[in-house]
From Swiss-Prot:
Gene that this polypeptide is encoded by: mcr2
Post-translational modification: Phosphorylated at Thr-283; may represent an intermediate in the catalytic mechanism.
GO cellular component: plasma membrane
Reactions this protein catalyses: lipid A (E. coli) + a 1,2-diacyl-sn-glycero-3-phosphoethanolamine + H(+) = lipid A 4'-(2-aminoethyl diphosphate) (E. coli) + a 1,2-diacyl-sn-glycerol
Stated name of the protein: Phosphatidylethanolamine transferase Mcr-2
Ranges that cross the membrane: 14-34, 47-67, 72-92, 121-141, 161-181
Length: 538
């Protein structure tokens, strides 16, 4: 009788399966890592070193897989690693994404609409080809588990092999690795899915510390005093436009060849600041930092919610605080203030300007509607209004503006940015800046309608910049340690009808640290914590 043997009837040792998965991940999830490594160490002169890197990555991958994989969770763990490798490598290879804790926090706060913008055919092809199909093979594989004693020996042997693969290359090329880790340290952040796994563990530790942290607010401005009251002068009405994803080198006032802010160019008395650096490279990190007393050197995004911020101080002193948000949310900035002072403008519930485009995306200008009612309800009071933009949020820049701002053509109308002709990507991004220009100009126009009764002022600062394909990097979110300047150099503008608010010199080197003292000065508030800190006004 003829026997028939199907491939799925053959069994496989669990440690062989782990090795195959580790090899697959090392080979398919790290294309960007090897590309970055070879850019620093050309293959023509460093073939041995590059090969040693590949072996070391395989060793590290095997070590991680073996550490996480045990009999009763073997297949779920391997499948999870395969899916994670496919997803993380797609965004790394496509957008240059690096998975540090800040990026993970930003990803967790990404809403459904933003996630949809990142989904495309290439994404699903990658996930199916490098994630789902290998996972199916793992799921149907028949695993021949050894006895407990043999399994322990085989696990130890596999650990030994992984350590040999990891350490021997480092030993053979020790001088080059010493230089690599010292001078080119950022390149290692591109290793997937090891970096995401490490960052998940680190983030879990951070979240645990937050969960066990004291809930009492840590005050930084108990000594804050308002030196003049609205009863002694004209009350102040200030709009702070919290920008999104605008970069300084695409602003005409900073030498850019295009008129991306033509309406602001016509505003008398507008001050531009050309040398401003953001606190971070993501909304989740930068926005709380923009209102912090700590300054970016001492700022900790994980404990920011427990810290008094400048809005808490101004609210305590009687300044009316209002936050309207067409982005994600206030990132914790408004958490300690009454919910009645925060309004979501990302849906038609509050935003009346959502049907001007094919995407039914609510526009930033909708946040201006109805502000007169707020002013009337707080007549004679100092007021600070935050307008948090959608701005230039990527990758779907073409969705961020209406047809009247489509000045630069053709435009990239997709979210696979690397596949777009580079100039079309720039065109879409610059058109979105034209919409921001219009929004800021309209904010100033609205303030001017209240000049008779208020000293009015407008401050605009973007939360971070954006990479548009420079060196193969797109979007934002890179760790500060090696973020390109495009992700941290941001535009900032100031305008007021009050001539006593003298803007700082345009080329003054400033950071997001200048925002808190500026907001205090606009309401004649002094606080020792920031009394010597540079501001946008003198």
């Amino acid at each position: 009788m003829t026997s028939h043997h199907s491939w799925y009837r053959y069994s496989i040792n669990p440690f062989v399966l782990m090795g195959l998965v580790a090899l697959f991940l090392a080979a398919t999830a790290n294309l960007t890592f090897f590309e970055k490594a070879m850019a620093v160490y050309p293959v023509s002169d460093n073939l041995g070193f590059i090969i040693s890197m590949a072996v070391a990555v395989m060793g590290a991958m095997l070590l991680i897989v073996v550490l996480l994989s045990y009999r009763y969770v073997l297949k779920p763990v391997l499948i999870l690693l395969l899916i994670m490798g496919a997803v993380t490598s797609y965004f790394t290879d496509t957008y240059g994404t690096v998975y540090d804790t800040t990026m993970l926090q930003n990803a967790m706060q990404t809403d459904q609409a933003e996630s949809k913008d990142l989904m495309n055919l290439a994404f699903f092809v990658r996930i199916i080809g490098l994630g789902v199909l290998p996972s199916v093979l793992v799921a149907v594989a028949k695993v021949n588990y050894p006895t407990w004693g043999k399994g322990l020996i085989q696990r130890a042997m596999t650990w030994g092999v992984s350590l040999v693969l990891l350490l021997v290359p480092i030993g053979l090329f020790s001088s080059q690795y010493a230089s690599f880790f010292r001078v080119h340290k950022p390149v290692r952040f591109y290793i997937n899915p090891i970096t995401p796994i490490y960052s998940v563990g680190k983030l879990a530790s951070i979240e645990y510390k937050k969960a066990t942290a004291p809930t009492d607010t840590i005050y930084h401005a108990k000594d804050a005093v308002q030196t003049t009251k609205p009863s002694e002068r004209k009350p102040r009405l200030v709009v702070f436009v919290v920008g999104e994803t605008a970069r300084a080198d695409h602003v005409q006032f900073n030498g850019y060849g295009r008129e991306t802010f033509p309406q602001l160019a016509k505003v008398d008395g507008l001050a531009n600041f050309s040398q401003v650096t953001s606190c971070g490279t993501s909304t989740a990190y930068s926005v709380p930092c923009m209102f912090s007393y700590l300054g970016q050197d001492d700022y900790d995004v994980d404990t920011a919610k427990y810290q008094e911020n400048v809005l808490d101080t101004l609210d305590r002193l009687g300044v009316g605080i209002l936050w309207r948000d067409n982005n994600s949310d206030s990132k914790g900035v408004m958490d300690k203030l009454p919910a009645t002072q925060y309004f979501d403008y990302k849906s038609a519930t509050n935003n009346t300007i959502c049907n001007t485009n094919p995407y039914n995306e609510c526009r930033d200008v909708g946040m201006l509607v109805g502000l007169d009612d707020y002013v009337s309800a707080n007549n004679g009071k100092d007021m600070l209004i935050m307008l948090h933009q959608m701005g230039n949020h990527g990758p779907a820049y073409f969705k961020r503006y209406d047809e009247q701002f489509a000045k630069f053509t053709p435009v990239c109308e997709g979210n696979e940015l690397a596949k777009c002709e580079h100039q079309s990507l720039i065109n879409a991004y610059d058109n979105a800046l034209l919409a921001t220009d219009d929004f800021i100009a309209k904010s100033i126009d609205w303030l001017k309608t209240h000049e008779a009764n208020y000293d009015v002022a407008m401050l605009y600062v973007s939360d971070h910049g954006e990479s548009l394909g420079e060196n193969g990097v797109y979007l934002h979110g890179m760790p500060n340690a090696f973020a390109p300047k495009e992700q941290r150099a941001v535009p900032a503008f100031f305008w007021s009808n009050n001539t006593t608010f003298k803007p700082t010199a345009s080329d003054t080197v400033l950071t997001h640290d200048a925002i808190t003292p500026t907001l205090l000065k606009l309401f004649d508030v002094t606080a020792g914590k920031v009394k010597d800190r540079a501001a946008f006004i003198q």
